[in-house]
Amino acid sequence: MTLHTDTIVAQATAPGRGGVGIIRVSGPKAKDVALAVIGKELKPRYAEYAPFKDENGLELDQGIALYFPNPHSFTGEDVLELQGHGGPVVMDMLIKRILKIDGIRTARPGEFSERAFLNDKMDLAQAEAIADLIDASSEEAAKSALNSLQGVFSNKINTLVESLIYLRIYVEAAIDFPEEEIDFLADGKVSGDLQGIIDNLNAVRKEANQGAIMREGMKVVIAGRPNAGKSSLLNALSGKDTAIVTDIAGTTRDVLREHIHIDGMPLHIIDTAGLREASDEVERIGIERAWDEIAQADRVLFMVDGTTTDATDPKLIWPEFLDRLPKNMGMTVIRNKADQTGEDLGICHVNDPTLIRLSAKTGEGVDALRNHLKECMGFSGNQEGGFMARRRHLEALEKAAQHLDIGQQQLEGYMAGEILAEELRIAQQHLSEITGEFTSDDLLGRIFTSFCIGK
């Protein structure tokens, strides 16, 4: 356990007006704060109603006080929580009062969670889950974040790490004792155990990818020529009139954003200005912003007005658009206005892109598009027992998988035990970065400073 010598204070509840506001204090002087503000020692882990006083004994507020001595607290240190009235002025007066006590400072963003991590109250993935739970934008995301906080993700990682450790011991024993009559590397155990670890890792990667989608969502840009129905599609997907829709080409001049959920999957929809030769400076800026959004998208919905062309292949519809589209960008062709053309609604493939025929105006075919977007991201929607994951987690899992693949190739091709042992060690290190067992101070700083103050 790493007990800090300084004591920190911050408001744990969100800033602004509320019925209740909570001040959190953590560190060796938490008990001194209770004596100074309340005037007496508090019984550990009991809620006590008391007045909160300034240095002159004048009452600032009154509320509930709770004291948690180390190590049985959120941070693993002595912790005091003062639950008062949630007005910003009241909270500010209480914090200023506490800061007048020597040896107490304002907490940095995420410092309470950081201390909990450093004091082994939780691992790094669990600490990150606190922020994810607070930021959850759907019920499904909240459940996944809570699972991570309860250790579902960490337990899977720890199981993989333990398996790697046992396999490393076996492989290194085979290297260190070559005089043994049994060829440990050729007896099939190492190969079988390694394949089992790879299979389990791939299963965790699949779950983690779902968790990352749940956290970060999918950025979809609707692009195409003016008056193709882009704004109508934005309204149809979001279920509200976010964008102005008229028969006048070029009505949308700037980027419009809407955030929705499809069976729990966050979807960031972006409607852009119609792409054409700009008629004025305002339109030119809007078109450039449209291309900027396209460059950052996970997928582009290429809108086509079905009443203007019978073509379905984007190479025939607008080759210049494809030429400027970023390489490897996922694209779906949307033939709009099926209510006017009489085309059959549905999904099919034209060369590589998927083609969807729909009517953004009537909403026919839009459900097929929603299901298509889930499939594009590999989102199952079934997150019972799932966990939240971040991009850094996916990167660590990917690196671990790469090194296990290299080790497997060396084992099967050359019986290279030394190289296999090294690849196992590196894979173990990458997995341990997820829970924080092997993590640089720089990474810890970047993770915890992204938290709210008071968390």
Swiss-Prot record:
One of its GO terms (molecular function) is GTP binding. GTP binds at residues 227-232, 246-252, 271-274, 336-339. The keyword Zinc does not apply. It comes from the Bacteria. Keywords: Cytoplasm, GTP-binding, Hydrolase, Magnesium, Metal-binding, Nucleotide-binding, Potassium, tRNA processing. It is an enzyme of class 3 (hydrolase). Mg(2+) binds at residues 231, 252. Its main location: cytoplasm. (6S)-5-formyl-5,6,7,8-tetrahydrofolate binds at residues 24, 81, 121, 455. Residues 217-378 form the TrmE-type G domain. Its cofactor is K(+). It is found in: Cytoplasm. Binds 1 potassium ion per subunit. Exhibits a very high intrinsic GTPase hydrolysis rate. Involved in the addition of a carboxymethylaminomethyl (cmnm) group at the wobble position (U34) of certain tRNAs, forming tRNA-cmnm(5)s(2)U34. HAMAP family: GTPase_MnmE (MF_00379). This is tRNA modification GTPase MnmE. The gene is mnmE.
